[in-house]
Regions:
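Secondary-structure boundary elements
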Residues: 2-155, 190-191, 243
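Hydrophobic/aromatic-rich core segments of domains that either
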Residues: 112-120, 125-131, 140-150, 155-247
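Beta-strand-rich domain onsets/edges
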Residues: 245-266
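Conserved small/polar residues in nucleotide/adenosyl-binding loops
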Residues: 267-274
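Short, ordered, surface-exposed loop/turn motifs in non-cytosolic proteins
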Residues: 276-278
């Protein structure tokens, strides 16, 4: 799963530092179970970078089952072998998308979607998953905490952040790299929005979550996105993709993806502080 030795060593170092810090409660007991090298690498990555609450809230077996289903999708879906390990590691393997409660959606969605998409191209599979998402969830505004993917299916509605969380979970369940993209403020109105990007054959495409269109890179927000000042997403781990890195923390990398929506150029500014003699 991590063929680069330096990257593998960095993940292992981050994992060990965290394990050495969190010594109470047998939080890492799952690593005492027999695992394949692939399983152990995936679990090490998840535990190195997932939020602390996720480690404490769910047993290790929950994450191990999700890891197994991620590998199952990679093995059984026709595009599994063409997804690079970097995109698989950062955009398929993680369970969390936003601040939703975690659930068993990966397994449930995979079993429901696999026969629907297995004979499609990767491009068409993304479109078909979004059609399926539209069948399950419609847009309704709300202010509550982001619902989990299965909760959104149960209620059959969600705001844009919930629809995009749900759609990312559905795409990842069948081994398609996906991420939630967020703009905190449009240029034309004092409002925000969240949607989805999916990786197809070396390129990231955008789509309106639960808003199916005949092609990718088409949505009601094409025009406002082309004038937006910030489109960003958070990626678990030390992500070293081609996108502009805005911020790094020990747990995630925040990237700016605005160049997927409009031509961009860079201006370098230097601030000088002038001290007054007053």
């Amino acid at each position: 799963m991590i063929s680069d030795e330096a990257e593998r060593a960095a993940v292992q170092q981050d994992f060990e530092a965290r394990r050495d810090t969190l010594t109470q409660g047998n939080l890492f007991q799952v690593f005492e179970q027999p695992m394949s090298d692939e399983q152990k690498e995936a679990m090490t990555f998840l535990y190195a970078y997932m939020p602390l609450a996720d480690i404490a809230d769910h047993p290790g077996e929950f994450y191990l089952e999700n890891v197994d289903y991620a590998f199952k999708a990679r093995e059984e879906m026709p595009w599994g072998k063409v997804v690079p390990e970097r995109e698989f590691r950062h955009f398929v393997l993680p369970i969390r998308v936003n601040n939703e409660n975690l659930d068993d959606s990966r397994k449930v969605f995979y079993e429901e979607l696999k026969d629907r998409v297995k004979n499609l191209s990767l491009y068409d599979a993304v479109l078909e998953v979004n059609h399926w998402c539209h069948e399950k969830v419609i847009y309704t505004p709300s202010d509550a905490r982001t619902s989990s993917p299965l909760a959104s299916v149960k209620t059959a509605y969600g705001r844009c952040g919930e629809e995009s969380t749900f759609t990312v979970a559905a795409l990842r369940s069948v081994g398609i790299p996906a991420r939630q993209v967020y703009t905190p403020r449009w240029a034309h109105t004092d409002d925000n929005h969240a949607w989805v990007e999916a990786w197809v054959d070396g390129k990231w495409y955008f789509l309106g979550a639960c808003e199916p269109e005949p092609v990718l890179n088409l949505g009601w927000f094409n025009a406002p996105a082309s004038r937006g000042m910030l489109m960003h997403t958070k990626v678990f781990g030390r992500y070293n993709g081609p996108e502009e890195v805005m911020y790094r923390t020990p747990r995630y990398t925040e990237i700016n993806v605005i160049d997927n929506y409009a031509p961009v150029s860079y201006t370098h500014l230097r601030a000088h502080e002038t001290r007054s003699n007053l």
